[in-house]
């Protein structure tokens, strides 16, 4: 394995730290055929960006290549323009109804309360004591609904995450399909409730002026927003806390970084949870010197592309002068992340809360990573949370 760029995504060594494997893949084969996956694997930034942006050739909707897709899986993430355009516009319009100031205030209060509660002589697990509950509350408030039952929702959400690796482990597929159906039922209940406000209510109203969007498509798409908003945010928050515990100087007032937005952008690039995104080729063509045929699956390793030295100087470190907006952590083109603003808000608020409350983070044990390849995330992050001092200064 050390001499061959081939890698097995669920190998414990890869799960613990995939980036050395990504680097060898990128250096040896920016685009290559992975026999076990039965797909092309893309590790370079240029080719990855091309795949994500070209929906005419590389489809998210596998039905365009004649492959059946379960009805419960059809949502805005699995559609391409022009079918994708209507549901995305509907959701973007609904986003404008989210009260941003109230959202920011709520998030700040929640983070501050949890960090203060965790400051003790004993280490705390910041995955379950902070990142997961904060992210669930944030996406629920963003949608304008009460947070679902944490234990049940966590079980369904995790089943969906694990099913994303069903191409590597088929035993994970069935539980994921069941979980998607259950969460779609939850969202359908929200849509049927006349008392709902905010994003969900705005999405329901918008559907009445877009009759081509079915109730099932809207429910499935909101389920995807709920799930992605929770899992992506919570996993990124966990990874950000780990990096900040290892490098507390990142929040130093004398840092060369030009404010919280630059740091947030770099953490998405370096520590974004979404490792890979798949497409299917619907028209023969060339990609990175390889001939890609109709029906071939193409997997873009976003985490590899985001550390491509051809685009990012010192690609494995936080860059004090980042080239913002070039990473693929939020996708590209038609399928760029709807929740990018919420992710950035959570990161900026985390920075402020740590600085304003004089909180220091000290690792108190070895972090543990989940055995999932498509979405990377911590299962445990033991940290000593200490309140060192208080200051009123914070980034704007």
Regions found by a protein language model. Name each.
Residues 1-396:
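Cytochrome P450
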């Amino acid at each position: 394995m050390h001499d061959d760029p081939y890698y097995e995504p669920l190998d414990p060594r890869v799960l613990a730290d995939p980036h050395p494997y990504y680097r060898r893949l990128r250096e040896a084969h920016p685009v290559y055929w992975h026999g076990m996956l039965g797909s092309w694997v893309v590790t370079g930034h240029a080719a990855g960006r091309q795949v994500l942006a070209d929906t005419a050739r590389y489809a998210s909707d596998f039905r365009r290549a004649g492959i059946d897709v379960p009805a419960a899986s059809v949502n805005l993430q699995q559609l391409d323009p022009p079918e994708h355009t209507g549901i995305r516009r509907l959701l973007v319009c609904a986003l404008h109804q989210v009260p941003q100031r109230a959202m920011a205030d709520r998030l700040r209060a929640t983070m501050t309360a949890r960090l203060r509660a965790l400051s003790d002589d004993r280490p705390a697990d910041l995955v379950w004591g902070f990142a997961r509950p904060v992210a669930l509350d944030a996406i629920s408030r963003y949608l304008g609904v009460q947070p679902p039952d944490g234990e049940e929702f966590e079980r369904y959400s995790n089943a969906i995450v694990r099913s994303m690796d069903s191409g590597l482990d088929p035993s994970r597929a069935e539980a994921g399909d069941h979980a998607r159906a259950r969460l779609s039922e939850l969202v359908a209940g929200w849509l049927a409730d006349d008392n709902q406000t905010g994003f969900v209510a705005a999405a329901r109203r918008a559907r009445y002026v877009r009759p081509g969007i079915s109730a099932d498509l809207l429910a499935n798409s909101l389920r995807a927003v709920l799930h992605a908003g929770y899992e992506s945010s919570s996993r990124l928050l966990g990874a950000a806390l780990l990096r900040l515990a290892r490098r507390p100087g990142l929040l130093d007032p004398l840092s060369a970084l030009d404010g919280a937005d630059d740091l947030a952008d770099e953490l998405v690039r370096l520590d974004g949870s979404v490792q890979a995104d798949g497409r299917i080729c619907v028209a023969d063509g060339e990609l990175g010197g390889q001939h890609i045929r109709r029906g071939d699956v193409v997997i873009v390793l976003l985490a590899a592309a985001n550390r491509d030295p051809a685009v990012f100087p010192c690609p494995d470190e936080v860059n004090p002068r980042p080239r913002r907006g070039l990473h693929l952590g939020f996708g590209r083109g038609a399928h760029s992340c709807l929740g990018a603003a919420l992710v950035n808000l959570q990161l900026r608020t985390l920075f402020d809360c740590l600085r304003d409350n004089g909180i220091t983070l000290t690792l108190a044990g070895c972090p543990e990573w989940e055995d999932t390849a498509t979405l990377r995330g911590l299962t445990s992050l033991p940290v000593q949370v200490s309140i060192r001092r208080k200051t009123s200064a914070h980034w704007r």
